[in-house]
């Protein structure tokens, strides 16, 4: 099953919208990140696997390919990747994904950690016509500055 979500990448004081594509198949095993991720994004694989296991979710028996459409850096892609995987697994509804941007780092126990650059991400989400920006609670006040 194919699903796409949105994330954002901060460059200076600006942000760009990043499409996160997730494809889930029954054959093969593993989580593969493609699309020029940096080391922090590549490490998302281990954080996401641990978060899934520690919250009772299983990816075993499935091949998950995640494509990021621009060169990316930072751990803020954990949440959009995890949401995309959950939607592809039909664990969460994908209904709101086309109008939502996600940003957040996952800890190994599945809780969200704050990320940097939420203000430019909120501006970008608004400018792109997205209706929601989902961020960790610690980033909510910063994101709420943008209407």
Annotated model-derived regions:
Residues 1-147:
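Peripheral, non-AAA+ core regions of ATP-driven protein-machinery
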């Amino acid at each position: 099953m194919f699903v796409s979500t949105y994330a954002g990448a901060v460059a200076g004081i600006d942000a760009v919208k990043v499409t996160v594509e997730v494809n889930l198949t029954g054959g093969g095993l593993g989580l593969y990140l493609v699309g020029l991720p940096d080391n922090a994004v590549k490490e998302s694989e281990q954080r996401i696997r641990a978060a899934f296991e520690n919250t009772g979710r299983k990816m075993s028996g499935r091949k998950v390919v995640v494509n990021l459409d621009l060169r990316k850096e930072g751990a803020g892609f954990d949440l959009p990747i995890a949401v995309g995987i959950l939607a592809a697994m039909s664990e969460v509804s994908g209904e709101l994904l086309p109008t939502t941007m996600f940003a957040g780092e996952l800890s190994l126990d599945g809780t969200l950690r704050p990320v940097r650059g939420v203000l430019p991400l909120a501006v970008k989400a608004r400018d792109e016509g997205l209706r929601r920006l989902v961020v960790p609670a610690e980033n909510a006040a910063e994101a709420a500055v943008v209407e």
